[in-house]
C-alpha cells in the first residue's frame, strides 16, 4: 500500500511538472507578442513607420484573446515562426485546411493508434489476465459510458448506440485535451465543429424515434397527446423543441471550451496591460490554476455531451411502458 501511495504521488508530481512546463512554453509567444505591441505604442512616428513597412512587423491582434481561439489558416509558433497551411480550391469552393481541421485529424489519428494498440493488447491477453496501462484506463472509461451513461439513460437496447456514444465521447475528450498543448488549437472551441456533433446526435435521435414508434407515432408525439383544438399550439412548440436540444449541445460545448482559453490568455495579457513584470507571478499563478481546471473541464464537457446525447436518445425511443422495462421494473397493467 505504501508503494502504491508513493507511486501515485510520483505520478502526480510528474503530471504537475508537465502541466507547468506546458504553460511556461506558452509564455515566449505571449512575451514576444507583448514586446511587439509595446514597441508599436512607443510613439506616433514609430507606429507610422511600422505601418509603412519600416522594419517593425508587429500585429496588434497578438494580444487579442479572441485571436488565439478563432480558426485560421496558419499555426503561429512564436517566436520561432509561422507555418501557413496550403490553400485548396475546388470548383470555386474554398476547402483549404484550417487549424481546427488539422487538430481534428490529429485527434482522430491519436484515437486510432490508441484503439488499435488496446485491441492488440486484449488479443494477447488470456482470460485470467487483467488489462494494464492504457488498456486498463480505456476499460474503465468504456464501462463508465456503458453502465452509467448509455444503460442508465437509454435502457433496453442501449447496446446498439454504444459505438456512437463512445465515438463522440473519446473524440471530444481528445480534442479538448490536445487543445491544451502549447501552440495547438481546440477544435471543440469552433461552433461549426460542435454544431456538427450536435447534428449527428439530432439525426441519431430522430431516426431512432421513427424506428421505435413509426412515422405515425413520431408525428403523434408532436401533438403531445392533447385535444385537436390544442394542436395549433402544441405542434409548433414540440417542433421547436426538437431543435432546442441540438442547439443546447452546440452552445454548451463551444462556450465552455472557448471561455477557459480566453481566461488564460487574458490573465497572461495582464502583464502587458500593466506594463510591468511585477504582476507576472500573480498572472501566471492564476493562469496555472485555470489551466489545471481546464483539464477537468475537458473530461467534464465530453461526459456532459455524451450524457445529454444518451438522454435525448432514451427519451426518443421510450415506449408506452414509459421505460419501466428499460430500468428493470415490470410494467404495470
UniProtKB/Swiss-Prot annotation:
GO terms for molecular function: proton-transporting ATP synthase activity, rotational mechanism. The keyword Transmembrane helix applies. The keyword Transmembrane helix applies. GO terms for cellular component: plasma membrane; proton-transporting ATP synthase complex. The chain crosses the membrane at residues 100-120, 161-181, 185-205, 229-249, 254-274, 279-299, 300-320. It is a multi-pass membrane protein. PROSITE patterns: ATPASE_A. F-type ATPases have 2 components, CF(1) - the catalytic core - and CF(0) - the membrane proton channel. CF(1) has five subunits: alpha(3), beta(3), gamma(1), delta(1), epsilon(1). CF(0) has four main subunits: a, b, b' and c. PANTHER family: ATP SYNTHASE SUBUNIT A (PTHR11410:SF0). Key component of the proton channel; it plays a direct role in the translocation of protons across the membrane. This is ATP synthase subunit a.
Amino acid at each position: 500500500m505504501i508503494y502504491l501511495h508513493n507511486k501515485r504521488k510520483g505520478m502526480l508530481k510528474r503530471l504537475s511538472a508537465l502541466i507547468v512546463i506546458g504553460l511556461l512554453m506558452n509564455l515566449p509567444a505571449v512575451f514576444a507578442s507583448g514586446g511587439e505591441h509595446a514597441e508599436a505604442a512607443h510613439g506616433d512616428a514609430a507606429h507610422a513607420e511600422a505601418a509603412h513597412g519600416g522594419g517593425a512587423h508587429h500585429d496588434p491582434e497578438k494580444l487579442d484573446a479572441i485571436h488565439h481561439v478563432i480558426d485560421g489558416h496558419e499555426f503561429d509558433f512564436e517566436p520561432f515562426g509561422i507555418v501557413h497551411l496550403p490553400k485548396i480550391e475546388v470548383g470555386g469552393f474554398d476547402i483549404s485546411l484550417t487549424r481546427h481541421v488539422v487538430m481534428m485529424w490529429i485527434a482522430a489519428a491519436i484515437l486510432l493508434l490508441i484503439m488499435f494498440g488496446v485491441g492488440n493488447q486484449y488479443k494477447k491477453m488470456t482470460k485470467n489476465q487483467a488489462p494494464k496501462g492504457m488498456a486498463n484506463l480505456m476499460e474503465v472509461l468504456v464501462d463508465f459510458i456503458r453502465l452509467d451513461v448509455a444503460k442508465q439513460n437509454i435502457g433496453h437496447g442501449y447496446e446498439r448506440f454504444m459505438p456512437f456514444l463512445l465515438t463522440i465521447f473519446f473524440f471530444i475528450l481528445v480534442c479538448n485535451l490536445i487543445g491544451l498543448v502549447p501552440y495547438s488549437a481546440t477544435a471543440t472551441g469552433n461552433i461549426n465543429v460542435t454544431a456538427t456533433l450536435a447534428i449527428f446526435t439530432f439525426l441519431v435521435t430522430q431516426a431512432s424515434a421513427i424506428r421505435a414508434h413509426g412515422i405515425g407515432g413520431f408525428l403523434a408525439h408532436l401533438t403531445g397527446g392533447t385535444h385537436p383544438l390544442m394542436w395549433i399550439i402544441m405542434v409548433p412548440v414540440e417542433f421547436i423543441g426538437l431543435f432546442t436540444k441540438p442547439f443546447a449541445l452546440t452552445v454548451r460545448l463551444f462556450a465552455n471550451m472557448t471561455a477557459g482559453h480566453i481566461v488564460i490568455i487574458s490573465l497572461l495579457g495582464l502583464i502587458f496591460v500593466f506594463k510591468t513584470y511585477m504582476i507576472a507571478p500573480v498572472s501566471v499563478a492564476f493562469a496555472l490554476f485555470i489551466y489545471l481546471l481546464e483539464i477537468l473541464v475537458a473530461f467534464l464537457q465530453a461526459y456532459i455531451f455524451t450524457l445529454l446525447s444518451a438522454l435525448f436518445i432514451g427519451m426518443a425511443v421510450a415506449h408506452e411502458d414509459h421505460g419501466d422495462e428499460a430500468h428493470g421494473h415490470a410494467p404495470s397493467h
